[in-house]
Amino acid sequence: MFYNVLKAKKLVNNDENKIEKKILLQDKESCFDIIALEKNEIIGEHSSAVDTAVYVLDGKIEIHFEAEKYVLEKGELLMFKKDHQHKVLALKDSKFFLIKV
């Protein structure tokens, strides 16, 4: 069996003008990534081909879906269905898990 203990918050850093992403697991359309955004950084509008969950490890982010927006803070989880256009704005230096299944 394979076991690996990781310190999630230490896997990525909040670097100025750089979105940092580390792929933890990936298989075809599915993934489990950790992403770091500096305050005011934006991940531009996009969609996912599979259902997605975002779990905030640290900081505060805002996810925009057309006319709706959700603010997520440390410890909060947002799940959404595939094919929805959205963008992400970091309201504070933030780290979050991106889970696509």
Enumerate the language-model features and the residues they cover.
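A cytosolic small-molecule/anion-sensing beta-strand core signal
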Residues: 57-58, 73-74, 92
